[in-house]
Regions:
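HotDog/MaoC-like acyl-thioester-processing domains
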Residues: 2-41, 128-182
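Predominant activation on well-ordered alpha-helical scaffold segments within soluble catalytic domains
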Residues: 61-64, 96-100
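A generic structural signal for short beta-strands and their flanking turns/coil linkers
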Residues: 49-51, 59, 69, 112-121, ...
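Catalytic strand-loop segment that frames the active site of acyl-thioester-processing enzymes
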Residues: 17, 24-90, 107
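Generic structural detector for well-ordered beta-strands
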Residues: 48, 52-54, 124, 174-176
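Hydrophobic beta-strand-centered segment that forms part of the acyl-chain substrate-binding groove
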Residues: 83-87, 94, 100-138
Length: 182
C-alpha cells in the first residue's frame, strides 16, 4: 500500500526572511543561520514555516512498538474507523517528537557543534492527527539566554495540520545550542 503524500504548498510567511524580500510561491526553507550568534537576528520573529510532511501509519506503528503504547486508536484501523476520529490517530507524543526534525527543515544552523533538548513547557495537543495527515512546523524564537559555551533558546512551536484551522500541537520548547570550539 502506498502512503499518501502532501501536495506542494507554498508558504505564506516569507515576509519574515532576513532580507525582507518576499518570494511568492516558493518554499524558502531552510533559512541559513550562521552560528549561535546568528540566532539573535531571529529573536522575537517567526521563521518561515517548514515544508508539509506526511505522517504515515507506518510511523505511528513504529512509535507504538518503540514506546509500548499500542492503544487501538493508534494501531487498529478497523476499530478506529468506528471511533469518534474515524481513523487511527498519531500519538500526541509522536507529534511532539517531530519538533526537532521540523526545526531542521526550517533552519540550517551552521557552526554549531550540537543542540540538546532542555525542556518542554505548556504542551497542548489541540487537534488529533489522523494517519496520513500532512503536518508542518512553525517556530518563533522568543528568548535567547547565554550559557557556558553557547545559548539556551526558547521557542514557541506550532505544528499545523493541513485542512484544519486549529493546530495539532502548541508548545514552548527549550534547547541548548553549543558553538563549535575554535
Amino acid at each position: 500500500m502506498t502512503e499518501p503524500s502532501c501536495p506542494d504548498v507554498a508558504t505564506t510567511a516569507l515576509d519574515n526572511l532576513p532580507s525582507g524580500d518576499a518570494v511568492a510561491g516558493v518554499i524558502a526553507t531552510p533559512v541559513v543561520i550562521d552560528g549561535v550568534e546568528g540566532l539573535q537576528h531571529w529573536l522575537a520573529r517567526e521563521l518561515p514555516p517548514g515544508p508539509w510532511m506526511t505522517l504515515p501509519q507506518s510511523h505511528i506503528d513504529a512509535f507504538a512498538e518503540a514506546t509500548g503504547d499500542r492503544q487501538w486508536i493508534h494501531v487498529d484501523a478497523a476499530r478506529a474507523a468506528n471511533s469518534v476520529f474515524g481513523s487511527t490517530i498519531a500519538h500526541g507524543f509522536l507529534t511532539l517528537a517531530l519538533i526537532p526534525g521540523m526545526l531542521e527543515q526550517c533552519v540550517d544552523l551552521r557552526r554549531v557543534a550540537m543542540g540538546v533538548n532542555y525542556g518542554v513547557n505548556k504542551v497542548r495537543f489541540i487537534t488529533p492527527v489522523p494517519a496520513g495527515a500532512c503536518l508542518r512546523g512553525c517556530f518563533r524564537l522568543d528568548q535567547l539566554t547565554p550559557i557556558e559555551g553557547g545559548v539556551q533558546t526558547h521557542w514557541t512551536v506550532r505544528i499545523e495540520l493541513q485542512g484544519s484551522e486549529r493546530p495539532a500541537l502548541v508548545a514552548e520548547w527549550l534547547t541548548r545550542r553549543y558553538a563549535e570550539r575554535a
